Amino acid sequence: DSWTSSARTPVSTGPVTVAEDNGFAALGLPERLVERLARDGITTPFPIQDATIPDALAGRDVLGRGQTGSGKTLAFGLPTLARLLADGSGRVPRRPRALVLVPTRELAMQVSDALEPLVHVVGMRHKLVAGGLSYTTQISALERGIDLLIATPGRLIDLLDRGAVELGSIQVAILDEADHMAEMGFLPEVTRILDDVPEGGQRLL
């Protein structure tokens, strides 16, 4: 639902000039992210993005509600990448700096696919960890070091128990579809995961 906008222009393959009325630039996002969105014709934020991105950029905890297709992924993904970019700390093996927790593998894959171009353009790394996917590639990526971890609760608990990942460096914890995670009975796992995340970090729901 993230690579959509209320105003789209034809996709560009050459240099991108950000228009003065670009809505994402007006929100205060880093130029590289704004340019990458503009390259795909994404120039005008959806209401949920307008409402949540400024508070998220200011470091506040944010609760956003929206249906599929409302632009929630960009609403939390853009300010999270902006924060990590401003922080500038290097990657540390097994210690991601931001976490997106989602209820299902399918949703995790959607979030990963949506954020991949943005993660790439700011020179960061991300990894999806979920059941039904290779342990070997997931653990290998964590050992090399990533900035953003997208995970389902069960697989993340498993990797925590194996010592393959640590959450002590998480600056932003995002619960995507938190209501669905509760309905699916994941609250004990989510509680345990958040207990491993340092206090004082940012929470986006």
Predicted regions and their residues:
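SF2 helicase catalytic motif II
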Residues: 153-205
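Pre-Walker A (Motif I) flank of P-loop NTPase domains
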Residues: 58-64, 96-98, 146-147, 201-202
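Walker A/P-loop NTP-binding motif
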Residues: 50-62, 73-92, 106-109, 113-118, ...
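Short, conserved catalytic or interaction motifs in soluble domains
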Residues: 29, 76, 86-89, 113, ...
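Conserved pre-motif I regulatory segment
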Residues: 15-66, 176
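Conserved nucleic-acid-binding Ia/Ib motif block in the N-terminal RecA-like helicase ATPase lobe
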Residues: 32-35, 39-42, 91-161, 169-172
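Conserved glycine(s) of the Walker
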Residues: 69-71
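Intrinsically disordered, low-complexity accessory regions that flank the conserved helicase/ATPase core
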Residues: 1-21
